[in-house]
Amino acid sequence: MIGKLKGTIEEIGEDYALVDVHGVCYVAYCSARTLSRLGSVGEACILFIETYVREDQIRLFGFMAVLEREWFNLLQTVQGVGAKVALALLSTLTPSELANAIALQDRTAVSRAPGVGPKVAMRIVTELKNKVPAFAGEATNIGFKQELGEGVAPAPVSDAVSALTNLGYSRDQAANAIAAAMKVAGDEADSAKLIRLGLKELSR
């Protein structure tokens, strides 16, 4: 099993990188986000690898960080999510954004990834809700044990996150701040209170 490649970028394709390791070139399939950060042809690179062995082929999937590789595997525990969809999700959302979307039960954010329809998005946010803490690490500050509804974030939460993003904060910052606000205000808080507490959190 190959766990990591350390070599030189030989080629970057639409969904893969060709890495030369001491004269042997390996094809590693990667998310668009990983490919964009990898560097240029001729530069040194390091990829953490997940190896898939099938009867007729061996495929390598490459990641810039171990956390991304863990999410790749976690996502595929959901019915309907294979390697291609998992990479599409990681191309669209960072691990932190995925953790936030799952904690907020925000299937709309998850369904932004190509190949992820409403049913698969709902399965992802539902089935992974209680599995995320083991993989999130420091990717998010959200309290994962909160019950935020079925399939979509409650209106006050969505409104509060939207309000903070309209003020110039990233969705990741806004979601983290509102999650922290909910710990203080409780699940029944209205959007105005969540926004106020969220801004207080962001000002720290």
UniProtKB/Swiss-Prot annotation:
Q: For the region Flexible linker, what residue ranges are annotated?
A: 144-151
UniProt region (Domain II), positions on chain: 65-143
Q: Which UniProt keywords apply?
A: Cytoplasm, DNA damage, DNA recombination, DNA repair, DNA-binding
Q: What is its main location?
A: cytoplasm
Quaternary context: Homotetramer. Forms an RuvA(8)-RuvB(12)-Holliday junction (HJ) complex. HJ DNA is sandwiched between 2 RuvA tetramers; dsDNA enters through RuvA and exits via RuvB. An RuvB hexamer assembles on each DNA strand where it exits the tetramer. Each RuvB hexamer is contacted by two RuvA subunits (via domain III) on 2 adjacent RuvB subunits; this complex drives branch migration. In the full resolvosome a probable DNA-RuvA(4)-RuvB(12)-RuvC(2) complex forms which resolves the HJ.
Protein family (similarity comment): Belongs to the RuvA family.
Q: What is this protein called?
A: Holliday junction branch migration complex subunit RuvA
